[in-house]
Amino acid sequence: MKKLLTGFLVACALVVVYGHNLLPSSGIQANTKPQLTTTTSTAEAAGVTAQIAPDFTFTDLVTGKTTKLSDLRDKPVYLNFWATWCPPCVKELPHIQAKYEQYKDRINFVAISLDGEQEAPAQFIPSRGYTFPVGYGNERDISRAYNIEAIPASYIIGTDGTIKAQIVGSMDEADLESFLQKAF
């Protein structure tokens, strides 16, 4: 009887593992280890033009206003990709809120939800009292344009539209402060 039960449990475990691998996925993973890439200094040192941030249109979850990223060139942009199902993303949101309150007059903040639909972030953001701009757009096109494989992913985009720095992984408040300084 014990052998039968053990065999059954092993078979169930194999079905669960194999079945999980067959489920459709966006291919985007949650990343807890920040990996900073500063693109401008590397590009300038190599004598190469810095990468222009891919443009896209997003809709603000609160106002419903549609905006193009390229319309925000009056100030540097802090662009964050996140999702409600991503624990490292959710963990850094209070830090984003604190820095938004500190820098909103000097930096445009945009947090783009990659939840796949607007209902989850539309309920989540107000319930936590966050006031920084959160938008959504065509998740697949935006993810491809920015080559997003893991979130959270953050970018600093200069007023000239070039990517100044990018980081994949959750940041604490000190890390976020240091990252935002790349905007100036």
Predicted regions and their residues:
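Hydrophobic beta-strand anchors of alpha/beta hydrolase catalytic cores
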Residues: 78-79, 109
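Thiol-based oxidoreductase modules, predominantly thioredoxin-like and allied folds used
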Residues: 105-119, 130-139
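Thiol/disulfide oxidoreductase modules built on the thioredoxin-like
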Residues: 123-131, 137-184
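Short alpha-helix adjacent to the SAM-binding motif of class I
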Residues: 91, 98, 120-127
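A short beta-strand-turn-helix
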Residues: 55-77
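N-terminal targeting signals for export/organelle localization
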Residues: 1-55
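Active-site acidic short loop of glycosyltransferases
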Residues: 73-75, 105, 130-131, 148
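Conserved redox-active cysteine motifs that mediate thiol-disulfide chemistry
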Residues: 73, 81-101
